[in-house]
C-alpha cells in the first residue's frame, strides 16, 4: 500500500507469482502461467510461458541456458477491434552472447565477435540482400572502442587519456568531418570543457562549439558558458545556486542568438520554492522571469504544472506503480499510456480536444485518434508505418522505416506482401542518405535530448518533466 492508499495484491502458487491485482486501475492486472513437464521441448519447465497484462499477451520459448529464444507478443489496443501478433526470435552461443535476431518482417541480423569475445560486426539479411550496419569495431588493449566503421561509410575514432577517460572523438561522414571533439576533466573526472573543432558541412549543418563548466566543493555544477558558430551563432551563460541540503535554489540563464542575421536574446532568473512540510524535495513554485506552480500527489508524482508564462495548465495522472497514465494539456491535447507487466510503455494514444457550448455551459470532448505502439526496443509502429531499431550491445546504431502500420506488420507473419519490397528500397535510400549528415543536435550537459531523427517521434507531452 502506497501513501495514497492504493495497493497491489500478489497471488502465488508455491513460490511462483501468478497474479498481480491493481486496486485502482484493474486493466493493469497481470497474470502469469508457467511451463510444466509437457513444455520440456521448449526448455520452459518452471519458467513463464504466458504473460497477460494491459498490453495483451506474451508467449515465451527458451534455450538450453534459460535465454528467451522466441517471443510472441499479441497486442489488444483498447480503442481498436483488432489484435496484432508480433514475434521476435533470438539465437545465442554457448557464452550466452546474441548471435542472431530475427525481426517480424523476416530480416535476420547477425552479430560477429572477435577472438577476445568483443562485438566486431553487425549485418542484416533479407530476401537475399545483405545490409551492413557495422562493418568493423576495433578495440584498444583495455577493450575500449578505438574505431567504428559503419555500413554507410560513416567512421568514428576514439582516444582516451591515461585514466581511460574519453579525451577525443572524431566522426567522419561523406560530407566531411561531423565531429572533432576534445574532452577535458578535473581531478575527480568532472568535465571541465567540451570543444568541437569541426566546422560547418557543405549542407550548412554543424559548426564549432565549446562549453566550459565550473563546480563547487561538492562537485555540483555552478556555472556554465558556451558558444556555437555555424550557419548561425549562439551564446549561453548559466549559473546555479544551491541550498545547504543540496536543493537548487536559483537558476539564471542568458542566451544570445543570431539567426539569419537577426539578433535575439533571452534571460530568466528563476528561484525555486519547496514544500516545507511533508515533501521537502518537491518544487511548489518557481518565480522569476517564467513563473511556474506545481502540485504533487502523496506519492511524490507531479499532478499539476501551471505555466504562468505560457498561460496554460498541464495535468497528469499516475497509476499505483507511479507510471504516467495520462497527460491533459488544456487547449492542446490529451495523451494516454499503457504499460506491460515489466513497466515498459507499450502504447501511447493522443488526440486533440473540442469544446461545445450547450445552454450556456461548456462541454469538453477528447478524441484519441492517434496511437503509437512500442512493441519492443526493436519495433515502434504507428498509423503511418513502423520503425525498426538496431543495436550494438546497448547502443542504438541504426533505424529503418516501413510503411503500412500495424496491419502490414501483422501481415508479415505469413507470406510477405509486396509492400516489403518498397520498404527495402526506402531503407536503402535512408542508409545511403545517412552517410551524409542529416541532422546536428547539441544540448547542454544537464539537459535531456529525445530522439530527433525525422522518422522517430519526439514525446512533446513529456518535455517539461525536466527543469
What are the functions of these language-model segments?
Residues 9-34, 178, 235-286, 316-467:
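Short secondary-structure transition motifs
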